[in-house]
Amino acid sequence: RLLDGPLDFQVKSIYDGVLKGTDFKTYDSYRKKLLVFEKEYSSLIKIMDENSKLIDAYKKAAERSLSEPGKMSNELYAARNAQLEIEKKMNGNSSRSEIGENNPPSIRTHYRNAYSGVRTTYGPTGSHERSLNIAIQMAELIKPMIMKMKNETLPSIKVSLESNNAPDVLTD
């Protein structure tokens, strides 16, 4: 026999896997549900970033305004604190993460766990499905807070800044 020719053989599994893989229909429906959530989550993050930038800009405008010092401080302070609380619910406490301490589960931690369900060889498990559902529920609870900040709180602060003759720092 030659060593360089083709040789047919059968591969026998050493052991059976513990988990049975999911069927394509289940996997695909999970993947679609995850993608819908991913788009929603990404849009919430984008709005959060825009809100943070506006708060920072409005703070600069208040510092440069010709009105009495501190007049806008309470409104801006409350908006900033509300924004930080929302960020904590979405991503966990950044200070805790920085020093390696565990955070309570956030939308991000549930999303990451749910996302790992599409990267496994056997498909999403019940744990992945549960994490995705929790992330969706948490996002639904937090979305009204984000939208209130965007549509009510920040426009109200802008009107107050304009009435106090604060410069428009967004165009500077």
Residues covered by each model-derived region:
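Mature extracytoplasmic or organellar-lumen-exposed domains after removal of signal/transit peptides
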Residues: 7-19, 23-172
